[in-house]
Structure formats: C-alpha cells, structure tokens
Curated annotation (Swiss-Prot):
GO terms for biological process: translation. GO terms for cellular component: cytosolic large ribosomal subunit. GO terms for molecular function: 5S rRNA binding; structural constituent of ribosome. It comes from Chlamydia muridarum (strain MoPn / Nigg). Pfam families: Ribosomal_L18p. It comes from the Bacteria. Belongs to the universal ribosomal protein uL18 family. Part of the 50S ribosomal subunit; part of the 5S rRNA/L5/L18/L25 subcomplex. Contacts the 5S and 23S rRNAs. Keywords: Ribonucleoprotein, Ribosomal protein, RNA-binding, rRNA-binding. This is one of the proteins that bind and probably mediate the attachment of the 5S RNA into the large ribosomal subunit, where it forms part of the central protuberance. The keyword Nucleotide-binding does not apply. This is Large ribosomal subunit protein uL18.
C-alpha cells in the first residue's frame, strides 16, 4: 500500500513534468523557473539547450538579505520578479518562457510573474 507522502511527492513530480514537457528555454528565450518551499522562493533563468543556469535569485541570496527580502510572501515575490528581470536585462534577455513547476499560477508564483513583467520581461 502506498503511503500518503509518496502519493503527494509523486503527484507533484508528475504535475511538474506535465508542465515542463511543453517548455524549452534557449539562450535567447530562457525558461524562468519558480520553486517555492515552506519558507523560501527560488527563481532561475535557465538555458535548456546548454543545460546552464543563466541567473538566479532567492530569498536566501545575499542581495535579498540586504534588501530585506527574506520571507516568503507576495510582496517579496514581486520584488524577486523585478530583480530577476534586472539580471535578465543585464544578460540581454527580454523574452522568457514561464515555468510554474507543479504549483498553480496563483499567489506567490503569480506575483513573481507580475514582478518580472514590471521589470520588462515579456512572456
């Protein structure tokens, strides 16, 4: 018999694969990946062709700690979206593919996307 924890984690992995199988990022149009945990938010620009992370920021990063963005809430998520847009602009990236992972496009995930749009990234 399967445990409830196993069902939960395998279901989350299936949802993430279902979303990611349609998304491919390149150096010109990288994938903006959002991962959230119970305490933190992680945002990355990923080039899937090379298999490299172009830029990343999280609520654990030094730049976030100096800005006071250390907790997982919607205000900080929006600020992280703006900061990842600035990092993308410095890499001459203006178009992205948004990867919400296994999460609904709601709350913190939606605020990261809104912040990235405000920062000048186009989806």
């Amino acid at each position: 018999m399967e445990s409830s924890l196993y069902k939960k984690t395998s279901g989350k992995a299936r949802r993430a694969l279902r979303v990611r199988k349609a998304l491919k990022g390149s150096s010109l149009k990288p994938r903006l990946s959002v991962v959230k945990t119970n305490k933190h938010i992680y945002v990355q620009l990923i080039d899937d062709v090379e298999g490299k992370t172009l830029a990343s920021i999280s609520t654990l990063a030094k730049i976030s700690k100096t800005s006071g963005l250390t907790k997982k809430n919607q205000d900080n998520a929006k600020a992280l979206g703006v900061k990842i847009a600035e990092l993308g602009k410095s890499l001459q990236v203006d178009r992205i593919v948004f990867d919400r992972g296994a999460h609904k496009y709601h709350g913190v995930v939606a605020m990261v996307a809104d912040g990235a749009r405000e920062g000048g990234l186009q989806f």
